[in-house]
């Protein structure tokens, strides 16, 4: 399991290694939306919150889907991933057909008028962020893996199995890691 930092870029999955026990990132799968010399930004895909979007964010009364914890940075900010960069201004393409952000008021209007379906958007509170060099150091410590991302992974609701399935999809020795207990010392 070589250092995979060089393969990391926007549009890739960042997967917490089994050794990463820090509570914010334990067994998480993140979508990286920005990765450059200045730092990195991503969103945790498998940490839904108890709140629904319609309960927590004004203007999105039609979205009866869970709000997600995007990460521990600026948890008072709302972010969204979506598939409708064709109609949302200022959206940044992360993967072919998958976009980050854009005009939130325009998004609200397009959802409320039925142009965009709620299933085409995922909302996050906060984000995961790393300063220049920080994530590279964490890779060297063995804290992270990478994998290719797909729109299906971003919008799945199989949160409980996302980490093990994503690790297992890497094949080889990763299959053993995917089946490891959460607290290996407790065996």
Swiss-Prot record:
Known Pfam families for this protein?
A: DUF179 (PF02622)
Task: Give the signal peptide, or none.
Answer: none
Coiled-coil residues: none
Annotated InterPro entries = AlgH-like
Enumerate the transmembrane spans.
Answer: none
Q: Which GO terms describe its cellular component?
A: cytosol
For this protein, the record's SUPFAM superfamilies field holds:
VC0467-like (SSF143456)
Family according to the record: Belongs to the UPF0301 (AlgH) family.
HAMAP family, A to Z = UPF0301
Put simply, this protein is called UPF0301 protein Cpar_0662
